[in-house]
Amino acid sequence: MYKLFFRLVFKRMDPEQAHYAAFRWIRLAARIPVLRTFVAAALAPRYKELRTEALGLRMHGPFGLAAGFDKNAVAIDGMAMLGFDHIEIGTVTGEPQPGNPKKRLFRLVADRALINRMGFNNEGSAAVAARLAARNPVFRTTVGVNIGKTKVVPEAEAAADYVKSTEALAAHADYLVVNVSSPNTPGLRNLQATESLRPLLTAVREAADRTVTARRVPLLVKIAPDLADEDVDAVADLAVELGLDGIIATNTTIAREGLGLKSGPELLGETGGLSGAPLKARSLEVLSRLYARVGDRITLVGVGGIENAEDAWQRILAGATLVQGYSAFIYEGPFYARAIHKGLAARLATSPYATLAEAVGAETRKKAAL
C-alpha cells in the first residue's frame, strides 16, 4: 500500500515537501491517544530476544532512527510509535540556521538513494533544548542528540560552538553525538583529522561532565565513509584513548564513482551527501574495520544502506551493537522498523547465537581467526 502511495503521490512531490507532509501526519497520529495506541500495537511489537543494552542504556531493540529526519526534536513520540528503538535527533547547531538554499534534497529512486545538501537546517541548541525540557513523553524511548558546527563559525572556533550545544543539550540527551562528517558544512570534515578531533572531543566531554553531574552522558563521534583506511584506524585509536563511548559508521558519501549508480547525470551531478543502498558496502567495510580495531571496548553503531533485516543482521555480525536507518524509511514507509525487527528475531532464532549480544562482531572475529 505505501509503495503504491509513494509512486502515486510522494514521488510526484518535491522531496523536501513530501518529507514535511509525512512528518506532519506522523506527529498528528502521535497526538491522538486511540490512534497512536493502535499504530504502535501494529508497527512496534516488542521482541524480548532483541532487547539491547548499549551505552549503559536499556533499549527495546537495536534498531533506531538516524539523525537527519527529526532535526528539531518535534516527533520523538511519533517515531517511537513507528517502532524505532532509539531516536537520534539533529543535527543541532549552536546557533539557529536556515541551511542551504533550496532545492537541496533529491531522490535517486532507481538507486534507492538520496542526495542531500541540507546544511544543518535547524532551530539551534537553545530552542531544541527548551523543547526537550518541556517534553512529556508518551513512549519510553532512548533519545540521542547529534550536534554539529554552526556554518558561520570559523573552524578555529568550532570547539566553542560544540561546547555551546553540549551545555544546552547534554542534560536532555540519553547520549550525545559529535558530527564531524557531514559534507554540507564547509570545512567540517577537516575536523575528522585526529589533531583537530582530539581537542574538540576533549572539550565536549569536559562540557558534558560539567553540565550533567548526576550521570555520565555517553559520547560518540560520527564519521564519514570517505575516510582512508588509515584514518579510520586513527579515529578508532583516538576514541579508545579518549574513553569515548562509541563511533557511528557512517555518514553520507561524496563519492559517485564505483557505487554502481543507475540514476542519470542530472541527478548524479547534484552536490551533497549520498545516502541509501549504494552506501551499503563501504559502510559495512568501515564498520568491520572499526570492530577489528576496537573490539568490544566501545559501542559501534552501523548506519548506511540498511534496507532490510538482512542488512541489519550483517552489521551486527560485523560489530554493530546498534543499527540505524533513514533513507530506506523514505522508500519502505511505516512498516520499515517492524520488518527489521521481525527479520532480526527470525535470524537470531535460526543462528548459532543464544543472544543478540553474542552475535555482535561474530563474523569479524571469525575472519580475524583465519
Which residues fall in each region the model found?
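A gly/proline- and charged-residue-enriched helix-loop-helix capping module
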Residues: 90-140
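Glycine-rich phosphate-binding active-site loops on the catalytic face of alpha/beta enzymes
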Residues: 85-97, 180-182, 246-256, 305-306, ...
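Glycine/Thr-rich beta-alpha phosphate-binding loop at enzyme active sites
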Residues: 36-45, 183-196, 238-296
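Active-site glycine- and acidic-residue-rich loops that bind
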Residues: 150-163, 190, 196, 220-241
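An N-cap/entry alpha-helix motif that binds or orients negatively charged groups
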Residues: 2-52, 116, 121, 125-126
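C-terminal helical cap(s) of enzyme catalytic domains, especially alpha/beta-barrels
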Residues: 96-112, 257-272, 329-353
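Catalytic cores of alpha/beta
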Residues: 72-81, 227-240, 292, 296, ...
